[in-house]
């Protein structure tokens, strides 16, 4: 239910010029702590400005220590951490943002808004430069902001120790060798914390009920921060129902009824920073169907709907593995058809070699007709990424398209496995 997917150049290696992109030795440059960089994005459909908010030192870096340079090249935004006046890259990270999705809305053509966002990096031992990039619709990287971080700067605030219980839901594996997920509750009152802990167990059960996650149970840690809300359930503006909740999740995000997200980035990141994390997942205490997932940003899923298990996994496909939605609508044109999308499970055939061409039997037609004889065949089926024409998906059905098949296709499974290994090896 990711509202918008955008595109990537197959020649993305140019995005850093001549900078050195080999993996680096973690302990040489970084401490065990995490640096959170809070910033603002101000803009509309056509323009954007960046402004630094603050720097926060958090207790524990939750990301990888071996794979510090992000060679996935996923996402519409990325950061690079370098030594000042040097071509030596220490860390890079790709991601997407709620702001980027908002820029595609009709509202963005009429008004200017500001969004609070954050990135986290390993806490440096010496001064570093952090450069922020955004990609155009043609996936050309554009530098947006550069800051110098001095780890001895007394304006770097230590993260507050919050008075909320932390629950170890699943796993006790080394942080550097695991995918660390933090679960946050929204719309659970203090009296409903027991329900939240049960929903956390439901999350874990759901996660490991689907391939390929079921094969990697020893590579995940799941922790939860037990923050109560004043009100039960979450906000539903279209029904004139407004709840006071810990994370302010709301349906009708961008005026799309089922899209349930939060604009309160600072609260979300402050709570998440109480534990080491790679991925943030908000469980919304409501029976209404909905949710959302943004790559390397956060996911939301409701817990009371009969499709809750499927929604949890579908949204995590967006947030964790960068998977695109494979369903389509008439009259949408989110993708530029002469550019290969960055998401691993859709293609414009501009650079199909970089996608799943190696998984297609040479007897399968490309594009592949949607016919019963191809029902379980990896092919190239038209209609994906919200567009009925010019964008193709790997199979007739998949969890990223509908919940009828109740499983990921082989292409999505491979993409998920690659991401698990990226974080854990």
Q: Model-derived features: where do they sit?
A:
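Beta-strand-enriched, solvent-exposed domains that form extended recognition/catalytic surfaces
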Residues: 29-154
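Active-site-proximal segments of metallohydrolase catalytic domains
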Residues: 219-295
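Bacterial Sec-dependent N-terminal signal peptides
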Residues: 1-25
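Short pre-active-site segment immediately N-terminal to the catalytic Zn-binding motif
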Residues: 193-196, 291-315
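Solvent-exposed loop/turn segments at secondary-structure junctions
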Residues: 187-190, 228-232, 286-290, 306-308, ...
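Fold-level signature of zinc-dependent metallopeptidase catalytic domains
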Residues: 155-211, 224-234
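Catalytic Zn2+-binding segment of zinc metalloproteases
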Residues: 316-332
């Amino acid at each position: 239910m990711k509202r918008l997917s955008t595109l990537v150049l197959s020649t993305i290696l140019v995005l850093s010029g001549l900078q050195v992109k080999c993996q680096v030795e973690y302990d040489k440059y970084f401490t065990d702590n995490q640096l959170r960089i809070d910033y603002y994005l101000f803009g509309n459909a056509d323009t954007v400005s960046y402004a630094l908010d603050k720097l926060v030192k958090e207790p524990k870096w939750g990301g990888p220590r071996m794979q510090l340079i992000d060679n996935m090249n996923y996402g519409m935004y990325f950061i690079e951490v370098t030594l000042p006046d040097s071509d030596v890259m220490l860390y890079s990270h790709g991601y997407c943002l709620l702001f980027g999705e908002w820029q595609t809305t009709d509202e963005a053509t009429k008004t200017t808004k500001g969004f609070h966002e954050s990135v986290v990096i390993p806490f440096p031992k010496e001064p570093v430069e952090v450069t922020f990039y955004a990609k155009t619709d043609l996936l050309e990287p554009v530098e947006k902001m550069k800051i110098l971080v001095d780890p001895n700067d007394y304006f770097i605030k230590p993260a507050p120790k919050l008075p909320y219980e932390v629950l170890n839901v699943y796993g006790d594996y080394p942080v550097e060798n695991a995918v660390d997920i933090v679960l946050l509750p929204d719309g659970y009152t203090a009296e409903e914390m027991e329900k939240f802990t049960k929903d956390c167990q439901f999350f874990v059960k759901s996660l490991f009920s689907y391939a390929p996650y079921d094969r990697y149970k020893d590579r995940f840690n799941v922790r939860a921060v037990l923050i109560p809300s004043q009100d039960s359930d979450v906000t539903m503006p279209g029904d004139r129902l407004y709840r006071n909740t810990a994370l302010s999740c709301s349906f009708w995000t961008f005026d799309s009824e089922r899209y349930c997200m939060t604009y309160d980035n600072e609260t979300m990141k402050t709570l998440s920073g109480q534990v080491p994390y790679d991925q943030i997942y908000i469980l919304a205490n409501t029976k209404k169907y909905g949710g959302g997932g943004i790559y390397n940003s956060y996911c939301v899923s409701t817990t009371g709907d009969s499709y809750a298990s499927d929604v949890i996994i579908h949204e995590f496909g967006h947030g964790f593995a960068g998977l695109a939605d494979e369903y389509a609508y008439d009259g949408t044109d989110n993708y530029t058809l002469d550019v290969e999308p960055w998401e691993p499970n859709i293609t414009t055939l501009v650079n199909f070699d970089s996608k799943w061409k190696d998984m297609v039997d040479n007897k399968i037609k490309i594009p592949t007709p949607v016919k019963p004889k191809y029902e379980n065949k990896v092919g190239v089926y038209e209609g994906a990424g919200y567009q009925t024409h010019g964008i193709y998906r790997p199979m007739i059905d998949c969890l990223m398209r509908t919940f009828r098949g109740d499983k990921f296709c082989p292409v999505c499974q491979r993409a998920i496995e690659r991401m698990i290994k990226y974080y854990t090896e």
